[in-house]
């Protein structure tokens, strides 16, 4: 096949996906169960290092109403380079280094789909629980804050690491979705609020794309025969 023919075929396929046929009525996506998956990047920083962006995957459950939806899901970030943060004992003022390499976030919130079109924007807000997986106090002596002089110091450093490893956060999301029958393809950006005494400093950000598929109605049809 000639290059121009390939280009023309690709353009026709793209148009078919992005724009519904003339006169086609957009499918009603109200009151449906959607299961979906995402992949993208997780941007974070600590009080010991600037922003890093590492890979993230997630799954979610979307239950639609007319123009709103309940959004429930979870995401896991895998840090390619071990992250380092410093925790401070509020009672003694002593500081200890902590390392970790994974972050998990569970969330719930409300989404709005105002246009109900083939291509539509969406936005939402909610709350979540962000957890640094298996934070470990560093007692290697490599830095002045990685010293545990006694077993009691080591135990205290580990307790501080665990205490600073999980916090509640708020979040906001925005994106664009392309609907093709029961399938939806989307791209989105999410920002998570900062939390006090947390191993992650400031807001965190996720940039992701994904798909979700409707597996049926979330509302029983009362007119159907039983």
Residue ranges and their predicted role:
Residues 19, 23-66, 212, 216-218, ...:
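Short glycine/proline- and aromatic-enriched beta-strand/turn motifs that initiate or cap beta-hairpins
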Residues 27-35, 66-70, 117-123, 181-183, ...:
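Outer-envelope beta-barrel architecture signal
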Residues 31-33, 51-57, 100-106, 119, ...:
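Residues that define the transmembrane beta-barrel architecture of outer-membrane proteins
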Residues 35-39, 72-74, 108, 121-125, ...:
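Membrane-embedded beta-strand positions of outer-membrane beta-barrel proteins
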Residues 39-47, 79-86, 129-134, 190-198, ...:
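Sequence/structural signature of outer-membrane beta-barrel proteins
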Residues 43-47, 91-98, 155-162, 194-199:
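Extracellular loop and loop/strand-boundary signature of outer-membrane beta-barrel proteins
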Residues 55-142, 214-215:
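Gram-negative (and chloroplast) outer-membrane scaffold detector with strong preference
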